[in-house]
Regions:
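Secretory targeting signatures
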Residues: 1-68, 73-75, 311, 360-404
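Surface-exposed beta-strand/loop patches in extracellular or lumenal glycoproteins
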Residues: 156, 283-309
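Solvent-exposed loop and beta-edge segments used for protein-protein assembly and interaction
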Residues: 272-276, 286-288, 303-305, 344-346, ...
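C-terminal beta-strand-rich structural cap/linker in extracellular carbohydrate-active enzymes
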Residues: 328-370
Length: 404
């Protein structure tokens, strides 16, 4: 009898164990409710009423805010003097590095009777003359734009200690000419859209066409990604990067912005910006494609794991490319479709190639990745409890039989 009892107990234990083993895969497998990827939420028409603010309450890694007093524009990243009578700029200084860098001694614009008072609002300083506008940016590159609607001469004096001054001209194309130079070990460039440069020593004569755009931009002195910044300057010089838009979302559906233009006919502006989502418009009257840079602070557009980016152009998904060099240097050879690449620069910086820049609506969304499936969902947990109950009952019966 003892042998028979032990055999029955063993069978009961084996059956219980088999039941547990058969139920555990249910508990541990993919039977938990699936977590579908979050859908791309449409930006409603009510969002388009958001009004960007002008003053930047705190410096960001993308831009800060100018203060303009007594003819001097003071910023976190850039500083210069402005003559309201002649429209001349003096001593453009980059403040990004450990020590200030004097990039430009002076800029004198021919035929510049000031049309209205100069003003600084947020990261933008703007002064207008006769058919010409100066726009300076308080950003790490000390970006400066001079847009002219008539042919004119602009004289730029570089510091006497400038080195590696180099002129590149490609007549008949936009970007027609560029001048690169180094000051105190830091690199900077001048870009001219349709006209040409003459360089004598440290004097640069920019012959602007009608209309034309003269741009200054430097490699941020404190950056750990100088090679990537040089690639950006190369792409601007080649005419492949045509605009930049820096965005930081704040409370109540508002945002701060810093738009930069590298081609005179391309406009890029935000329609709505909030944490994790932005709607942007790109437009031009010229055919052909190019790259636009869209930069966000990490809080506005998280891109690090476990989040991912969704980019759409006119409602169509845009594929991500890891071939940034082709995107910058030969975008047309890479693909005829829109594509984007993430640049290793501060914040979330997207290089977006568009095969056409005419009337393009761009959406960028940061989507949290689904959390890992829990080891036990409610249904699986109930199955495990039932299995353990069976084991307990079988064990109790086995013990009673042994006692008998």
């Amino acid at each position: 009898m003892e042998d028979g009892t032990d055999a029955r107990a063993f069978l009961a234990k084996a059956a219980a164990t088999f039941t547990v083993l058969s139920l555990l895969p249910v508990a541990l497998s993919g039977s938990a409710p699936s977590h579908a990827s979050a859908a791309l939420r449409t930006i409603s028409s009510s969002d388009f009423g958001a009004v960007p603010i002008g003053d930047v309450p705190w410096p960001t890694s993308l831009f800060a805010s100018f203060t303009y007093e007594h003819g001097v524009a003071f910023g976190t990243y850039a500083q210069f003097a402005y003559n309201a009578t002649t429209g001349a700029l003096r001593s453009l200084i980059g403040l990004e590095g450990r020590a200030p860098v004097l990039f430009l001694e002076s800029i004198d614009i021919e035929g510049f009777p000031p049309a209205r008072s100069a003003a600084a609002r947020g990261p933008i300083f703007e002064a207008a003359g006769y058919l010409v506008t100066i726009t300076a940016h308080d950003d790490p590159t000390a970006l400066l734009e001079i847009r002219s609607d008539m042919a004119r001469l602009v004289t730029v004096e570089l510091p006497a200690w400038s080195t590696n001054i180099s002129l590149v001209s490609v007549p008949g194309s936009w970007r027609a000419s560029s001048v690169s130079f180094v000051v105190q070990g830091e690199e900077a460039r001048l870009f001219l859209g349709a006209g040409w440069f003459n360089v004598t020593g440290t004097t640069v004569l920019a012959h602007l066409a009608s209309p034309d755009l003269l741009v200054f931009k430097s490699v941020p002195a404190a950056s750990k990604n100088k090679a990537e910044w040089r690639a950006v300057l190369d792409a601007i010089s080649a005419g492949h990067v045509v605009s930049e838009l820096d965005l930081v979302a704040i409370a109540d559906g508002r945002w701060m912005q810093n738009p930069g233009r590298y081609r005179i006919d391309v406009a890029t502006w935000p329609l709505a910006v909030r944490a994790g989502q932005a709607s942007i418009q790109v437009d031009t009257l010229r055919p052909g494609g190019a790259v636009v840079l869209l930069a966000f602070d990490p809080e506005t557009m998280p891109a690090a794991d476990p989040t991912r980016l969704i980019v759409r152009a006119n409602g169509n998904p845009v594929n991500r490319s890891n071939d940034t060099l082709s995107l910058f240097y030969a975008p047309d050879s890479l693909t005829r479709d829109a594509s984007y690449s993430l640049l290793p620069l501060p914040g979330t910086v997207i290089a977006l190639y568009l095969p056409s820049l005419a009337a393009v609506s761009v959406e960028v969304v940061s989507v949290p990745q689904p959390a890992p499936n829990p080891a036990f969902d409610p249904g699986s947990e109930a199955a495990v409890v039932a299995a353990l109950a069976i084991v307990s009952v079988a064990a109790a019966r086995m013990l009673r039989r042994r006692e008998e």
